[in-house]
Structures are given as structure tokens and as C-alpha cells.
């Protein structure tokens, strides 16, 4: 029987033959550990280590856009905003500076045009009809009226206005120096009675030089620059050269001449120190005026050379001025008529 169960295998072991579950037919239909079905699957049956846990790859998340930084300092309403680069700002600043420069030039040209327009209007209406004398500036109740009309900004070309103004200030300084010289000579006469002649001459100089210097050298210079007159330039050069010599003599201060110069001040220093100091200040003032007078004479001469004036032009202007004078023409006509009548009466 055993032989019949094992299929006639005499070499089979007795245990295996007695185990009914070792039947090949049964083993064939037993579930395998490698191919387990769902109903017989036991998760605790395997002894292999569980696979390591692999987390899913993280999906990259775009960082949130940061809000634009705002300056903690608020711009004032008048403060310009920075809309461009440095080069743009530099070019804008250069353009602005150029525009300002052109605007200033246009303003100067407009002022010059206004001045010329006023000159043309005065010339068209007539100088005597519209221009009233305004110098010297006397009060209205004074019985003496102004003798000259003077307006440097209107009558003198712009390039010569500074020179004419400087000469006007020089004349004013010379007048002030003569007044201080009179006071110094008065003080000197008070401390030293022998200086009476100098005190008397100081009064004469202030009364003589003040009006004569204005009429003899300042007015010719003013008219020369106003109308580009060569004859007035020559009159000015001759008289102002003499005036410069007088300025030097005033600064030297020869005793008895009525000038409180350096020599007179040093002489009085032995008598009274306070009066000598006053005379030294006047001498210093005279010295400054003399230096400025020499400098201005050279400067005006250089301007005269650049204007194209000449001695021949001065002669022509002088001749034209003489023959255009009605009094001169009347005198010349009378002289010619008298000479002709005498010639016909001669035997």
C-alpha cells in the first residue's frame, strides 16, 4: 500500500510518504510566497526589511516679489525728482545754464536797445525842447538854476560809462580834497600865524578850481565820449595834463602856496602834532588823487587811440564848428563887406 501511495518509489523517506500535504499535487496548488493572492496575503509574513521611504521631490515655489523700497525721506513739492541717470541730469543742468546765459545776454541787449530808443526820441524831439538842465542839482527854491544836462546812462555809450563815471568821482574827490585842505590850512593858521598867506590861497583854490575843473576838463571829456569828438578830446588832454601837474604840486605842499602837502605837514609837525596829522591825511588824499589822475589820463588816451580819432579830424571838427556858428558867420560877412567897401572907396 505504501508502495502504491508513493507511486512505486522505493527510495522515498518514510516521513515524506506519510505526510499527505507533501503530495506533489497539493504542493503545486499551494500559494507561493512570491505570488501571493489577495485573500491569503499576510503583510507580516515577509521577513525582508521594508524599502526606505523616499519623499516626493519638492515642487519649486517662486519667491514672492518684494515690494519696492520707498525712501523714508519724502520729497518736498519743490524738490526735483530723479527721473534719469547722472549723464541725463548733467546734460539737463548744462542746457539750463546755457539758457540762463542766453537770457542774461538778451536782457543786456534789451537794455541797450531801450537806451538807444530813448536817445533817438530825444534827438527827434529836439535837445532843447525835452532836456532840462539837471546839474548842479540845486533845490527848486534856489534862484540859480542848473547849468548843464548830464545823464551818463543815457548819453554815454555803454563801453565808456565806467570811464566817465570814474572821472566824475575823481572830480568830486578833488573838490572834497580842496575843502579838507581849506580846513587844514585854517588849523595851521590858528597854531602858526605866519601861515596866513597859505590860508588865504586855500580859499582862492577852492573857489577857483572847483568850477573851473568841471568846465575845463570834465565837460570836454564828457562831450568827447558822448559824440566821439576829437576836438573835445584834445581840449581834455591839454587841460587835464595841467590838472595832473597841479595834483602833484598839491601833494608836495610847498609852504606858502596854500596846499597842505607833505612838506607843509612836516613843517607844522614841529609846532603842533594834531594839526600836522590832519595835514598829513590831506597830503595822502592829494597823493591818491594825483596817482588816479595820471592813470585815468593814460587810460583815456588809449581809448582815444582805439576810436580812430586824429588831429586832422579835430581840425575838421573845429573848422566846421566855427563856420557853423551864426555869430562867426555874421562877423566874417561884415568884415568881408567892409573890406570890399573900403577897396571901392580907395582912390
From Swiss-Prot:
The modification Phosphotyrosine is found at residues 41, 53, 83. One of its GO terms (biological process) is protein transport. It comes from the Eukaryota. Residues 49-67 have a biased composition (Pro residues). GO terms for cellular component: recycling endosome membrane; trans-Golgi network membrane. There is a cross-link at residue 313 (Glycyl lysine isopeptide (Lys-Gly) (interchain with G-Cter in SUMO1)). It is a multi-pass membrane protein. Keywords: Isopeptide bond, Membrane, Phosphoprotein, Protein transport, Transmembrane, Transmembrane helix, Transport, Ubl conjugation. It is found in: Membrane. Functions in post-Golgi recycling pathways. Acts as a recycling carrier to the cell surface. This is Secretory carrier-associated membrane protein 3. It comes from Bos taurus. The gene is SCAMP3.
Amino acid at each position: 500500500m505504501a508502495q502504491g501511495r508513493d507511486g512505486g518509489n522505493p527510495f522515498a523517506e518514510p516521513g515524506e510518504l506519510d505526510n499527505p500535504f507533501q503530495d506533489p499535487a497539493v504542493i503545486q496548488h499551494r500559494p507561493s510566497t512570491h505570488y501571493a493572492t489577495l485573500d491569503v496575503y499576510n503583510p507580516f509574513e515577509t521577513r525582508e526589511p521594508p524599502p526606505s521611504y523616499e519623499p516626493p521631490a519638492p515642487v519649486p515655489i517662486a519667491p514672492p516679489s518684494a515690494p519696492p523700497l520707498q525712501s523714508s525721506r519724502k520729497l518736498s513739492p519743490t524738490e526735483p525728482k530723479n527721473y534719469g541717470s547722472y549723464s541725463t541730469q548733467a546734460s539737463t543742468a548744462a542746457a539750463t545754464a546755457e539758457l540762463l546765459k542766453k537770457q542774461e545776454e538778451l536782457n543786456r541787449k534789451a537794455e541797450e536797445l531801450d537806451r538807444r530808443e530813448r536817445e533817438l526820441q530825444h534827438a527827434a524831439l529836439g535837445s532843447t525842447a525835452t532836456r532840462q538842465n539837471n546839474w548842479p542839482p540845486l533845490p527848486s527854491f534856489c534862484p540859480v538854476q542848473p547849468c548843464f544836462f548830464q545823464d551818463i546812462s543815457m548819453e554815454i555809450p555803454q563801453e565808456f560809462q565806467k570811464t566817465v563815471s570814474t572821472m566824475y568821482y575823481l572830480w568830486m574827490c578833488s573838490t572834497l580834497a580842496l575843502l579838507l585842505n581849506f580846513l587844514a590850512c585854517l588849523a595851521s593858521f590858528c597854531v602858526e600865524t605866519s601861515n596866513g598867506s597859505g590860508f588865504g590861497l586855500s580859499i582862492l583854490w577852492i573857489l577857483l578850481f572847483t568850477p573851473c575843473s568841471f568846465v575845463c576838463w570834465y565837460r570836454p571829456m564828457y562831450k568827447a565820449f558822448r559824440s566821439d569828438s576829437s576836438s573835445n578830446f584834445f581840449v581834455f588832454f591839454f587841460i587835464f595834463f595841467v590838472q595832473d601837474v597841479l595834483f602833484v604840486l598839491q601833494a608836495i605842499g610847498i609852504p606858502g602856496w596854500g596846499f597842505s602837502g607833505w612838506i607843509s605837514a612836516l613843517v607844522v609837525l614841529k609846532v603842533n602834532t594834531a594839526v600836522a596829522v590832519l595835514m598829513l591825511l590831506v597830503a595822502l588824499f592829494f597823493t591818491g588823487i594825483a596817482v588816479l589822475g595820471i592813470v585815468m589820463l593814460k587810460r583815456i588816451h588809449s581809448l582815444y587811440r582805439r576810436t580812430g580819432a586824429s588831429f586832422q579830424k579835430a581840425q575838421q571838427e573845429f573848422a566846421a564848428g566855427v563856420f557853423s556858428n551864426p555869430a562867426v558867420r555874421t562877423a566874417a560877412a561884415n568884415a568881408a563887406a567892409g573890406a570890399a567897401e573900403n577897396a571901392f572907396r580907395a582912390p
